């Protein structure tokens, strides 16, 4: 089965599915061998492994070089963390074209301004993109893709920016209508109340993905109860590897 089809089926599944982060060919292979059905190509982790910050200091072509090694090393699908799409709608078109060439199954883009700001920076400004402009990126990506199963996930940062539930729903619906295959709803609270409030209003309009980095103590059964489709463990492999390298080096 094609990697794109595998990812599409995961997103459309009635069961909660999981992606684990990887940032190199080796880490991607480890994730697959651990039994994960898909991989999150984390922008933070890839940037960190290259020794740069998570704000587009690494170029998109440098990120794609790493993703190609990851794709070649594995048989499971990879969803790329595409930040803001690395520019405007033209950049998005070229990004999708290149991702398909290296057998990446999908891309997630967030509704922020390029260059992106990490969502968890303390007291950091979180300017959001214009809704119409971001919808244009989604449409551009869907128009250029050749594989019908290639997935575009729209990441909503309204909660991160402090704009509330109403804005989150407004943006998610606009992105769904623009053609997004799924919505990633992000939150920086230490509990999942914003996510669950959103799900109660959203219903089943489109599949929802989450990144429970901050609310990691929430039982996964609660995600199932709220009909969440995909949970992404976004940087666990990278953080764990840093700790082990530090321990070995200090010995």
Model-identified regions with their sequence ranges:
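Alpha/beta enzyme core
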Residues: 2-229, 233, 240-246
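Short, intrinsically disordered, charge-balanced linker/junction segments flanking boundaries
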Residues: 249-251
């Amino acid at each position: 089965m094609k990697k794109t089809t595998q990812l599409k089926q995961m997103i459309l599944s009635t069961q909660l599915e999981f992606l684990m982060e990887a940032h190199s060919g080796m880490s991607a292979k480890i994730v697959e061998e651990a039994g994960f059905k898909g991989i999150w190509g984390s922008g933070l982790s890839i940037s960190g492994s290259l020794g740069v910050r998570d704000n587009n200091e690494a170029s998109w072509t440098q990120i794609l070089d790493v993703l190609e090694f990851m794709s070649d090393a594995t048989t499971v699908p990879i969803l790329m963390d595409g930040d803001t799409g690395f520019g405007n709608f033209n950049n998005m078109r070229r990004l999708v074209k290149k991702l398909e060439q290296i057998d990446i199954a999908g891309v997630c883009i967030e509704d922020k301004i390029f260059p992106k700001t990490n969502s968890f920076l303390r007291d950091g400004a979180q300017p959001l993109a214009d809704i119409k402009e971001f919808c244009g990126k989604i449409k551009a990506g869907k128009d250029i893709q050749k594989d019908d199963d290639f997935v575009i996930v729209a990441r909503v940062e309204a909660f991160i920016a402090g704009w509330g539930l109403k804005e989150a729903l407004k943006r998610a619906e606009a992105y769904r209508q623009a053609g997004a295959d799924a919505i990633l709803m992000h939150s920086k609270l230490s509990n999942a109340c914003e996510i669950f409030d959103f799900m109660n209003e959203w219903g089943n309009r489109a599949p929802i993905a989450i990144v429970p980095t901050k609310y990691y103590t929430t039982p996964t059964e609660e995600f199932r109860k709220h009909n969440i489709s995909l949970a992404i463990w976004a940087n666990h492999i990278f953080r764990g590897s840093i700790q082990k390298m530090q321990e070995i080096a200090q010995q």
